[in-house]
A protein has these predicted regions:
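Active-site glycine-centered loops adjacent to acidic/histidine catalytic or metal-binding residues
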Residues: 112
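Active-site acidic/histidine proton-transfer and metal-coordination neighborhood
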Residues: 2-108, 118
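Gly/Pro-rich active-site loop or hairpin
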Residues: 6, 49, 85-93, 100, ...
């Protein structure tokens, strides 16, 4: 299951290649940021994935993307669920663990207001935690009413 965290090295490699292509395209357009949302990295049933293996794969993948594009800011956008029933990177805590383990200066987070409400997190607290660490690279503001991500404007 998953893309960057997939336990099949060929599939994870294809996902990593897409991230490299996104970085190249970002540079071509004169941009400086790439947001990675891991919609398929997760699970539907307990013990469906090897959690440690996926964590390690994701850390290595983020390190590789950051090393490939040291001139760009790479954002992780976490979400509690959708497309999978349970997303792997689903909270501010796990996102922070990934950031710490990857240990790359250009890796940070995009906080999505709706995603935080879906997980019953406090947006002000998340903003403070990532902001004080210098890892808050973006904020997405939309509604969702705290139960699903319909992506409608506020």
């Amino acid at each position: 299951m998953g893309d960057l965290g997939n336990q099949d090295p060929a599939l994870a490699g294809e996902a990593l290649k897409l991230c490299y292509e996104a970085c190249d395209y970002c540079r071509t357009c004169g941009g400086d940021t790439v947001t990675i949302w891991l919609g398929h990295d997760g699970f539907d049933y307990s013990f469906q994935i090897d959690y440690t293996h996926v964590f390690d794969n994701l850390v290595k993948a983020f390190q590789a993307v950051c090393d490939y594009a040291p001139d760009l800011h790479i954002f992780i956008e976490y979400k509690p669920y959708e497309e999978r029933s349970y997303a792997y990177i689903d909270t501010m805590g796990l996102t922070r663990m990934i950031l710490n383990a990857a240990d790359r200066e250009n890796l940070g987070v995009t906080l999505d207001y709706c995603h935080m409400l879906m997980k019953h997190e406090n947006p002000a607290m998340a903003t403070d935690i990532f902001g004080r660490a210098g890892k808050l690279y973006g904020i997405h503001l939309n509604d969702g009413y705290g139960v699903m991500d319909d992506g409608l404007m506020i």
